[in-house]
């Protein structure tokens, strides 16, 4: 279960991303207690209770939270006040650092197995310890998947791309998470922002999140991607994937290397 002020401040779509990655904690599922943010999100949506059914549903949903005296196997507290946008350097979602940070040194690993895994990841990704993330050039940028291509994600990326162009030599692709999201984005004109910046605007689907339908990036290409996994060859044969949020992917596409979305190129 994810809770606390940082989680409560997140919109529903960001909470979905958080729960999507719960398996990386070796969990079968991830939950966030429903609150007014969730109820407002559900109101009026297709398949949501409506009319006389709404209040009983709301009453039931308000009961779905952990009791104040609940006992958990383990509780972890994370101070998110100084949390920066993150990006991965290796071949697992856990291989993450701040976008303005550097590739870690395997010599600092907590045990031999972790050190070997880090060394293998660095070899595959063709990176070296201490290398600044901001110095890593990319070949492609991908915004898509069930994790980070909902409407709020597309708005975030479009905010970075507006008035800017994708760097020469960078392949940039956007795949909305669903047909409904694609239609909503087009109604807002977001598709024009992506196209004018140099992104391909494609039909919804899994696409190159996991090499679907044989579609992939090129051999050994380095891709910054808003997807949820960065395993070896996940996006193509020997493709090297850096996971990041949509705004980071957009900023990186413009700069041609991993970029901090808090300081957009040309801003």
From Swiss-Prot:
Gene (UniProt): leuC
GO biological process terms, semicolon-separated: L-leucine biosynthetic process
EC number assigned by the record: 4.2.1.33
UniProt-recorded name of the protein: 3-isopropylmalate dehydratase large subunit
Pathway(s): Amino-acid biosynthesis; L-leucine biosynthesis; L-leucine from 3-methyl-2-oxobutanoate: step 2/4
InterPro entries linked: Acnase/IPM_dHydase_lsu_aba_1/3, Acoase/IPM_deHydtase_lsu_aba, Aconitase_4Fe-4S_BS, Aconitase_4Fe-4S_dom, IPM_dehydratase_rel_enz
Cofactor: [4Fe-4S] cluster
MF terms (GO), sorted A to Z: 3-isopropylmalate dehydratase activity; 4 iron, 4 sulfur cluster binding; metal ion binding
Protein source organism: Cupriavidus necator (Alcaligenes eutrophus)
Binding residue positions for [4Fe-4S] cluster: 146, 206, 209
Family under the similarity heading: Belongs to the aconitase/IPM isomerase family. LeuC type 1 subfamily.
Subunit architecture: Heterodimer of LeuC and LeuD.
PANTHER family linked to this entry: 3-ISOPROPYLMALATE DEHYDRATASE, HOMOACONITASE, MITOCHONDRIAL-RELATED
Textual note on the cofactor: Binds 1 [4Fe-4S] cluster per subunit.
Catalytic activity field: (2R,3S)-3-isopropylmalate = (2S)-2-isopropylmalate
Function text: Catalyzes the isomerization between 2-isopropylmalate and 3-isopropylmalate, via the formation of 2-isopropylmaleate.
Alphabetically ordered keywords of this record: 4Fe-4S, Amino-acid biosynthesis, Branched-chain amino acid biosynthesis, Iron, Iron-sulfur, Leucine biosynthesis, Lyase, Metal-binding
SUPFAM superfamilies in the cross-refs: Aconitase iron-sulfur domain (SSF53732)
Enzyme class: lyase
């Amino acid at each position: 279960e994810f809770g606390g002020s940082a989680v409560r401040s997140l919109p529903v779509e960001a909470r979905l991303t958080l729960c999507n990655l719960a398996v990386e904690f070796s969990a079968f599922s991830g939950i966030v207690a429903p609150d007014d943010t969730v109820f407002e999100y559900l109101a009026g949506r297709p398949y949501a209770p409506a009319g006389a059914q709404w209040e009983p549903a709301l009453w039931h949903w308000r009961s779905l939270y952990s009791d104040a005296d609940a006992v958990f196997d383990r509780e972890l507290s994370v101070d998110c006040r100084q949390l920066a946008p993150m990006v991965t350097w290796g071949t697992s979602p856990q291989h993450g650092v701040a976008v303005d940070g550097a590739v870690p040194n395997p010599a600092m690993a907590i045990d031999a197995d972790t050190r070997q895994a880090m060394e293998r990841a660095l070899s595959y990704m063709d990176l070296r310890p201490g290398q600044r993330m901001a110095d890593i050039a990319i070949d492609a940028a991908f915004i898509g998947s069930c994790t980070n291509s909902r409407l709020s994600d597309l708005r975030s990326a479009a905010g970075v791309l507006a008035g800017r162009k994708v760097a020469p030599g960078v392949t940039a692709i956007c795949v909305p998470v669903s047909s409904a999201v694609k239609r909503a984005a087009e109604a807002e004109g977001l598709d024009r922002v992506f196209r004018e910046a140099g992104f391909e605007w494609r039909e919804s689907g899994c696409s190159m999140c996991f090499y679907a339908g044989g579609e992939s990036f090129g051999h050994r290409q380095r891709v910054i991607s808003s997807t949820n996994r960065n395993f070896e060859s996940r996006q193509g044969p020997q493709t090297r994937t850096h996971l990041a949020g949509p705004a980071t992917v957009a900023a990186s596409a413009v700069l041609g290397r991993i970029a901090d979305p808090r300081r957009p190129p040309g801003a």
